[in-house]
Amino acid sequence: MINYTIYENKDSNQWVTFVHGAGGSSSIWFKQIRDFQKEYNVLLLDLRGHGASQTKLKKAFKQKYTFSALANDILEVLDHLKIEKSHFVGISLGTILIRQLAEMYPERVQSMIMGGAILKMNFRSQILMVVGNTFKYVLPYLILYRFFAFVIMPNKN
């Protein structure tokens, strides 16, 4: 099961689940926790291969790394915590997974807030995802980040 952190609000039965982007971790949401916890129970996730959910290189190649597999990782945590329905907040890759989850299990998604939403991945994006997932074990994060920024960001015209 992927790593998760809970911030409880004893006066609420509603949940907000935060899903980070590629290369990130649940720590990106630290500024949002206090305000959301005033009204909701907060669930932070570290996606497979990120943050405290990182796997060993040898094991990483044996796992299926698809959007539906990652969405099922999220569902596994919700089931484990007996969360029937949640609001979701996501950024970048997180938006893809929230959408995937909403398509697979619409009854589990109360609402979606999607920042920097990615609506579909073209072939180039899919290749970059595989390359990034493979090389993150052997290259420093900053080098990978700069490479992807160079490839993804638009050129000056």
Give residue ranges: language-model regions.
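Structural signature of beta-strand start/N-cap positions in the alpha/beta core
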Residues: 15, 41, 84-87, 108-111
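Conserved alpha/beta-hydrolase catalytic His-Asp/Glu region
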Residues: 123-125, 141-157
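Active-site loop/oxyanion-hole signature of alpha/beta-hydrolase fold enzymes
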Residues: 34, 43-89
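Gly/Ala-rich beta-loop-alpha elbow adjacent to hydrolase catalytic centers
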Residues: 90-94, 98
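Flexible "cap/lid" loop of the alpha/beta hydrolase fold
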Residues: 99, 103-104, 109-139
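Short, hydrophobic alpha-helix immediately C-terminal to the catalytic nucleophile
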Residues: 30, 75, 99-103
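Conserved HGGG/HGGXW glycine-rich cap/lid loop of the alpha/beta-hydrolase fold
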Residues: 5-59
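N-terminal cap/lid segment of alpha/beta-hydrolase-fold proteins
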Residues: 1-2
